[in-house]
Amino acid sequence: MNNTNKLIITIVCLVIIITIVEMYIRRKYAWAKISKAEEDAKKIKEDAKREAETLKKEATLEAKEEAHRLRSDLDKETRERRNEIQRLERRNLQREETLDKKNDLLEKRENGLNERENSIQERQNTIEQLYKEEREKLEQLSGLTSEEAKNLLLEEVNREIKHEKSIMIKEVEQKAKEEADKKAREIITYAIQRCAADHVAESTVYVVSLPNDEMKGRIIGREGRNIRAIETLTGVDLIIDDTPEAVILSGFDPVRREVAKVALEKLILDGRIHPARIEEMVEKAKKEVENNIKEEGEQATFETGVHGLHSELTRLLGRLKYRTSYGQNVLKHSIEVSYLAGFMAAELGIDPTFAKRAGLLHDIGKAVDHEVEGPHALIGAEVSKKYHELPLIVNAIGAHHGDVEPQSLEAILVQAADAISAARPGARRETLEAYIKRLEKLEEIANSYEGVEKSYAIQAGREIRIMVKPETVDDAGSIEMARGIVKKIEEQLEYPGQIKVNVIRETRAVEYAK
C-alpha cells in the first residue's frame, strides 16, 4: 500500500514537473515569438518608412519635372503667341500702308473725276446750247414746233414698228402652222402604218345555201305555216325566189338576221321543219348568237388591251359586230379607232390607256340607238356613264361627233382616229357609179371657172387641187375662186365629211445663159 502511494505521489510530482516545464517552454516560445514579431514589426516599420521616403522623393522629383514641363510649355506657348502677335502687327501695319496708298489713289481719282465732271458739265452746257440753237433753226425752217415734230416722229416710228410686228407675227404663225401640220402628218402617218385592220363590208341580207330545191317547199310548209313561223319568231323576211338552192334573209336588225340565219341552217341540217321545231331552233339560235356576241366583245377587249369593262358594255361591244356604217363593220371600225388613238397618244407622249379605251367604246351607242332616241354619241356617253366609266371616257365618247365640247386631248384623238378610220379609201362602201360621178362633178365645177388650167380630184374625192394660169388669176383671185368653188360644191353636191379645195398658182421665171 505504501509503495502504491509512493508511486502515485511520484507520478503526480512528475506530472507537475512536466507541466511546469511545458509551461516554461511555452512561455519561452511565446516570448521568443513576441520578440520576433516586435522585430518584424520594427523591420516593417523601417521598411515602410524607407519606402515612404523613396515615394516622397519620387513624387517630389515628378512634381519638379511636371513643373518644369509646364513651365517649358508655357514658355513655348508664350513665344508662339508673341510671334503670332508680332505677325498680326506686321500684317496690320502692311494693311495700314496699303490703305494709305489706296486712299491716296482714291483722292487722286476723285480729283480726276471732279475735273472730268466739270469738263463734261461744260460740254453738256455747250451741247444743250447748240441743240437749242439748232432746234430754233429747224423750227424756223420747218414751220413746226418741237412738240409737233416729236409727235410726228413718234407716229412714224409706231407705224414702222406695227408693220414689222405684223410681219414677224405672220412669219411665226406660218412657221408654227407648218411645223404643227408636219408633226400632225407624221403622227397620223405613223399611226396608220402601224394599224392594218381588216374590214368586212356587210349588207342587210344573208343568203343561206340549200342542199336542193326541194328544201324550199319544206321551208315554206303546208299553206306557208313554216315560213310564217320563222318570220314571226325572228322578225326577218324570208325571200324564196327562183335562185337555185338558196333562200334570202332580209332584215333591218342584224342581230335578228343572224338569229334567223343560224336557226335556218340548224333546221336544214336537222331536216325536221315544223312550227314547234322552228320555235325550238330559234331559241337555241338566240342563245348561240348571244354567246357569240359576248365572245366577240371579250375578243375585242383582248385584242386592244382594254380591261375592266362592265359585262354589259362588253356585251354591247359584241353587238357591234352585227352593225355596219356605210358598209363598214362597226366593231372592226371601233377596234381600228382604238389602235389609232392609242398609237397617236403614244407618239404625243400621253398614256395611251384612256385613248384606247375611249376609242373602243366611242360607237357603243350604235348597239342600242335603235331602241333609244338621240344621237349615238350621246347615247353611248349615257350608257358608259351608267356603267361607271370615267368622266374623261364619257366625254370622249360624247364628243367624237361634236355633240359636246371635247374636254381632253384623248377626246380630240378619238375624233381624229374616227375620221381617219372612216375616211380611209375602201373602209366604207360607195357604189362605183356614184363615186365616179361625184369625182367628175367636182372637176366639172372647178373647170367651169375662167383661168383654170387643170384640176384633179384626189383622196377619194375628199380634196380637189386646181392649177390656175398665173397670168390670168392673181393671188386675190385665187382666194375668191376657192370660196366660189366651195359654195358651188355645197350647193350642187351631196358628200360625206368635208372636201378640201386647194387652188394653186405657180409663177416661174426662166432665162437661158448663152
Swiss-Prot record:
Q: Name one GO cellular component term.
A: plasma membrane
Q: Where are the transmembrane segments?
A: 5-25
Q: Where would you say this protein principally sits, based on its record?
A: membrane
Indicate the segments forming the HD domain, all copies.
330-423
Q: Which UniProt keywords apply?
A: Cell membrane, Endonuclease, Hydrolase, Membrane, Nuclease, RNA-binding, Transmembrane, Transmembrane helix
Gene Ontology biological-process entries = mRNA catabolic process
Q: How does it sit in the membrane?
A: Single-pass membrane protein
Q: Which residue stretches belong to region Disordered? A: 50-82, 99-119
Q: Name one GO molecular function term.
A: RNA endonuclease activity
Which major enzyme category is it? hydrolase
Record carries keyword Ligase: no
> What's its EC?
3.1.-.-
RNA-binding as a keyword of this entry, yes or no, is yes
The cross-references to SUPFAM superfamilies, in alphabetical order and at most eight, read: Eukaryotic type KH-domain (KH-domain type I), HD-domain/PDEase-like
From the Swiss-Prot or TrEMBL record, state where the protein is found: Cell membrane
Q: How is this protein named in the record?
A: Ribonuclease Y
Please give the organism.
Answer: Clostridium acetobutylicum (strain ATCC 824 / DSM 792 / JCM 1419 / IAM 19013 / LMG 5710 / NBRC 13948 / NRRL B-527 / VKM B-1787 / 2291 / W)
